[in-house]
């Protein structure tokens, strides 16, 4: 019977029996881990404890029910300072305690020295310390109070202005008030465009048989005041800005050929006035004509380069070209009266941008009034100068109020069959006198006027 048993089945039964025995021996609670699992070098990622890994059944995170709640150990009274003691006073302090005591005594000794110095500088008698300890705070009150006057802070700051420029600007603004009030918008636009160029030249005289244009302005026109002086009879000399301030005219005199390259303004000429009654020492006044031509375009250069200052001996050519709309470049009168027709309009229509109208604004000057005069012969490059006609001459006079006046010195050889009353209102009164000997103005006077006028021109641009 025993031989019939299979040995394999016997072995299987033995293994089963051993496993059952092991299961019976296992405790009901958590099984203690084998010694190989308790390695202090291992750390659990779940609970963060050392000695096991996250796979181990010993981890309390996996078998939380079997984990023991940590119990508190007993209280230790020595840890908490429930009854603080008083600071101990040692009889023999150490070296560190001695340094602390010396530092506390030093500021106490320096306090009376500081008080004595403060009383010396402030000049106040020493105050007795109060028993309640308020003396220390009251003794330093004089440091907070300033002994000198307190500074006054003002928000409005006035700019520093040169007194000379202030006087000039006040006089200019008072003179411009009535003129600017009556200007039309078109006139104000032309005035603002020409203000950067300084006071322009005025037309002081023209040939009797030469046409002069006029422009109709919309609205009111400013009145130009003419003040008669003792140097010109019958009030025939019109006020002209100082010749020294005409730097643009000096530039034109230095470069007469550059005028042909500038843009031109075309206008129809008015009927000329007759000069057959003129002679040596005769006076002529111009007035408005019976007809006015159409409005001519006005060209104003807003940005001009800086004009170089030339010598004081050169008389500006634009002194006779600075009228209300400028005078023509060709001032040489034709020899015959038949050339005054439509053939002269191309020559008279050429104008330069510098001859823009501007209001008569002249700052006051403190230079002495010298009744000097200077005659200048104007050179022309026109075709009419080859016909044997005499050139025009301009006489500049210095008035009493520091201004300059100019008058034409024309020969009596020019005649015209036109009536003398047709050209009476085209320009203010201009006197035309006979040729006189050339009296030279001292160069220093002209150069001084040039410097004064340039400074006034800069002040005008700053004010506007």
UniProtKB/Swiss-Prot annotation:
Residues 180-197 have a biased composition (Low complexity). Residues 1-42, 70-389, 411-437 are annotated as: Disordered. Signal peptide: none annotated. It holds the Pfam family zf-CCHC_6. InterPro entries: FAM90, Znf-CCHC_6. PANTHER family: FAMILY WITH SEQUENCE SIMILARITY 90 MEMBER A11, PSEUDOGENE-RELATED, PROTEIN FAM90A1. Belongs to the FAM90 family. This is Protein FAM90A9.
């Amino acid at each position: 019977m025993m031989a019939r048993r299979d040995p394999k089945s016997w072995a299987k039964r033995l293994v089963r029996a051993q496993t059952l025995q092991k299961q019976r021996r296992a405790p009901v609670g958590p099984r203690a881990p084998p010694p190989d699992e308790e390695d202090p070098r291992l750390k659990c990622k779940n609970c963060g404890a050392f000695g096991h890994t996250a796979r181990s059944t010993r981890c309390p995170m996996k078998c939380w029910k079997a984990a023991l709640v940590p119990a508190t150990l007993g209280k230790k009274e020595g840890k908490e300072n429930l009854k603080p003691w008083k600071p101990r006073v040692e009889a023999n302090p150490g070296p560190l305690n001695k340094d602390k005591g010396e530092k506390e005594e030093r500021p106490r000794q320096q306090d009376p020295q500081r008080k004595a110095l403060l009383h010396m500088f402030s000049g106040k008698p020493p105050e007795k310390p109060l028993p309640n300890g308020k003396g220390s705070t009251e003794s330093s009150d004089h440091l907070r109070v300033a002994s000198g006057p307190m500074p006054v802070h003002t928000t409005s700051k006035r700019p520093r202005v040169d007194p000379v420029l202030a006087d000039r600007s006040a006089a200019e603004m008072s003179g411009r008030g009535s003129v600017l009030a009556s200007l039309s918008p078109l006139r104000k636009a032309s005035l603002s465009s020409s203000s950067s160029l300084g006071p322009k030249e005025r037309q002081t005289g023209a040939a009797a048989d030469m046409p002069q244009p006029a422009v109709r302005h919309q609205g009111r026109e400013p009145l130009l005041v003419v003040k008669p002086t003792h140097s010109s009879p019958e009030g025939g000399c019109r006020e002209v800005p100082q010749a020294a301030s005409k730097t643009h005219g000096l530039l034109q005199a230095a470069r007469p050929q550059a005028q042909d390259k500038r843009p031109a303004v075309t206008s129809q000429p008015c009927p000329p006035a007759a000069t057959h009654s003129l002679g040596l020492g005769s006076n002529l006044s111009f007035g408005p004509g019976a007809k006015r031509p159409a409005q001519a375009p006005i060209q104003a250069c807003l940005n001009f380069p800086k004009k170089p200052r030339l010598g004081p001996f050169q008389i500006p050519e634009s002194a006779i070209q600075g009228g209300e709309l400028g005078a023509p470049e060709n001032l040489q009168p034709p020899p015959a009266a038949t050339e005054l027709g439509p053939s002269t309009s191309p020559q008279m229509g050429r104008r330069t941008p510098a001859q823009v109208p501007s209001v008569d604004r002249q700052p006051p000057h403190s230079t002495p009034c010298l009744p000097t005069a200077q005659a200048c012969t104007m050179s022309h490059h026109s075709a009419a100068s080859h016909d044997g006609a005499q050139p025009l001459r301009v006489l500049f006079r210095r008035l009493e109020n520091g201004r300059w006046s100019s008058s034409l010195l024309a020969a009596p050889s020019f005649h015209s069959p036109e009536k003398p009353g047709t050209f009476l209102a085209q320009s203010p009164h201009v006197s035309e006198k006979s040729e006189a000997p050339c009296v030279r103005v001292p160069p220093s006077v002209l150069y001084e006027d040039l410097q004064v006028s340039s400074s006034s021109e800069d002040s005008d641009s700053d004010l506007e």
